[in-house]
């Protein structure tokens, strides 16, 4: 099953992906990670698209998306998890990534992009700081079970 974890930077997508990767024994990709599949971007994208299409009812693949252009790679049957956070939270986390300094142009960019995924179709909405990730993982497992008719592969 393909699980698309969608949202702006610094909303908690990677934290959720890391937890799911272990729980589901899944492969995980983010953004243009698929480029490691081939030397040519065009070929790598085709290989990745095929891999996602084949994983719809087999191996679990988590795809972390923070740019809208990559949404088109998700198969129709993928589980879509929208992860959001308050703008102040995003700015605070982004500043930590930049060693405590958030330049004004970066803050402006975050403000412009804030909410850009909010209208995207999703199966689950995770609100950073409000949603319990263990409960989110259980919900995702339940969706996998419903869509595939079988229990997901869970690591002990």
PLM feature segments, named:
Residues 8:
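P-loop (Walker A) phosphate-binding loop of NTP-binding proteins
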Residues 17-58:
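Conserved substrate/cofactor phosphate-moiety recognition/catalytic segment
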Residues 5:
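Hydrophobic anchor at the beta1->P-loop junction of P-loop NTPases
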Residues 74-94:
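Conserved phosphate-donor/acceptor-positioning beta-strand/loop module used by diverse small-molecule
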Residues 11:
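ATP-binding Walker
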Residues 2:
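Walker A (P-loop) ATP-phosphate-binding motif of ABC ATPase nucleotide-binding domains
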Residues 14:
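Walker A/P-loop
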Residues 99-156:
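Small-molecule kinase domains that catalyze NTP-dependent phosphoryl transfer to phosphate-bearing small molecules
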């Amino acid at each position: 099953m393909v699980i698309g974890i969608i949202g702006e930077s610094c909303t908690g997508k990677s934290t959720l992906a890391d937890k799911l990767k272990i729980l589901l024994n899944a492969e995980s990709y983010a953004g243009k990670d698929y480029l490691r599949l081939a030397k040519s971007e065009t070929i790598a994208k085709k290989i990745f698209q095929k891999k996602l299409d084949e994983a719809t009812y087999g191996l679990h693949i988590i795809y972390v998306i923070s740019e809208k252009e990559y949404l088109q790679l998700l198969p129709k049957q993928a589980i879509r998890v929208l992860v959001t956070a308050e703008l102040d939270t995003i700015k605070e986390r982004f500043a930590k990534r930049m060693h405590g300094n958030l330049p004004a142009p970066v803050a402006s960019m975050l403000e412009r992009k804030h909410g850009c995924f909010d209208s995207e179709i999703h199966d689950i909405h995770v609100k950073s700081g409000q949603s319990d990730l263990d409960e989110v993982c259980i919900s995702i497992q339940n969706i996998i079970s419903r869509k595939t008719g079988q229990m997901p592969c869970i690591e002990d």
